[in-house]
Regions:
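Solvent-exposed segments in extracellular or luminal domains encompassing
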Residues: 8-9
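Surface-exposed binding patches on compact interaction domains or structured appendages
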Residues: 1-4, 41-125
Length: 398
């Protein structure tokens, strides 16, 4: 028996009785059914603005506005909105694509999202379980195609923000106290890694599940880079060897990336080149998918965006990214008067001007000719994106 009612938006539980009658072989049978409808007490994560990522805690009930793409803002110069619009109008149902803990525990990864998400009235409602971690929920159309998807970051910490001091001693930005998707910023803890992103894309990929190793030296040991392919109770599949289509006109591969949020799109050509577009005009080379103003492709939760230019003192157009020197340049505490970054320790480095720790979480890079692992250089390298445009000679979105 399915009884459909409006959501109980009041503060109290509603009760009632339903009488069901049916006739069989000339005999009428009547049955009373007691109805109980609990108050709808979900926390509206989009109350202060929509985004592609929402922060939740364990053991809660949440909802968010799924009627608009991302933050409802711009799309850089990608022409995506002109072709596909901002509104989500053809959603039919919600589905959990994946849920995963940082350690890749496949049993506990099922405890991040509790049950199936529900899509109704332009909102997605979901419950969280007993485990922290990350997940992605999608809204699909009646044919089962993904219309849009959202990153759910389940973390019980109070995530805070503070001033970032640049090389000149000025406040360059107000930044989060950890990586996007991280459970902490504790050195040598796998929970500090956060999520991985292809530049300009809104959907996350999971970093390696391997523990940090103190002897990491950048040699890319496979045992230190075990991929995290857990999906919990999700229905999706991780794909790392897909090649982006050769499309020279914006919005190029953006629709493909939205349809396939769990697919890492390799460049159609060998090397670290764009997944987005193979064209050579400014719209293709500098599309502003992440830009000075938050876009619909920005992966950050409400109140945050991808960092802007010169966050770590590298001016736009400067091909040099040298930010550290020889061991002799540092004192016994790992600090150098010459460099902004302290010496490497505990699989990361600290920004001298604030003391913030930046873990070396590695990267994802998979090709058919270099296949060390899906994850690479965990604990030995770090790659941190900004919205800053790069010179044409070094343009890369992968």
């Amino acid at each position: 028996l399915l009884v459909e009612t409006l959501i109980n938006a009041g503060a109290e539980t509603l009760t009632g009785k339903l009488t069901v009658s049916a006739e069989k072989n000339g005999e009428t049978v009547t049955q009373e059914v007691a109805l109980v409808q609990r108050a709808e007490r979900s926390v509206n994560l989009s109350a202060e603005g929509t985004a592609n990522c929402y922060i939740a805690r364990t053991g809660g009930v949440y909802k968010f506005d799924a009627s608009v793409k991302g933050n409802g803002g711009g799309d850089g110069v990608s022409d995506y909105i002109a072709n596909y619009g901002l509104a989500i109008e053809d959603g039919a149902f919600a589905e959990l694509l994946w849920e995963s803990r940082h350690d890749g525990d496949k049993t506990m990864s099922r405890e991040i999202i509790d049950g199936a998400p529900i899509y109704r009235g332009g909102y997605v409602t979901f419950s969280t379980g007993r485990s922290e971690g990350n997940a992605v929920i999608a809204v699909k159309d009646i044919k089962g195609n993904i219309v849009w998807s959202w990153h759910i970051w389940v973390c019980n910490d109070e995530i805070t923000a503070h001033d970032h001091i640049d090389s000149e001693g000025k406040v360059a930005a107000v930044i989060m106290d950890r990586n996007l998707g991280a459970l902490n910023n504790t050195p040598m803890d796998v929970g500090n890694r956060g999520m991985f992103y292809e530049w300009g894309r809104k959907d996350p990929f999971t970093p390696s599940r391997s523990p940090y190793h103190a002897d990491t030296d950048g040699n890319n040991v496979p045992a230190y880079n075990e991929p995290n392919t857990a999906i919990g109770d999700g229905t999706g599949t991780w794909v790392y060897n897909a090649q982006a289509a050769v499309l020279a006109t914006p919005p190029a591969n953006i629709p493909n990336s939205i349809l396939n949020p769990m697919t890492y799109l390799q460049s159609p050509y060998n090397g670290h080149a764009d997944w987005y577009c193979t064209g050579t005009d400014p719209k293709a080379t500098h599309p502003g998918l992440w830009g000075p103003e938050k876009t619909i492709f920005d992966p950050c939760p409400p109140g945050y965006k991808v960092p802007g230019p010169d966050l770590w003192g590298i001016p736009a157009g400067n091909n040099s990214i040298t930010n550290g020197g020889a061991a002799a340049d540092y004192d016994e505490t790992g600090v150098s008067a010459k460099w902004d970054w302290n010496a490497y320790e505990d699989c990361g480095r600290r920004w001298k001007n604030t003391g913030d720790f930046y873990p070396m979480a590695g990267n994802i890079y998979y090709t058919d000719y270099i296949s060390v692992s899906i994850c690479n250089y965990t604990g030995g390298m770090a790659f941190y994106w900004t919205a800053q445009a790069t010179p044409d000679a070094t343009k890369s979105s992968a």
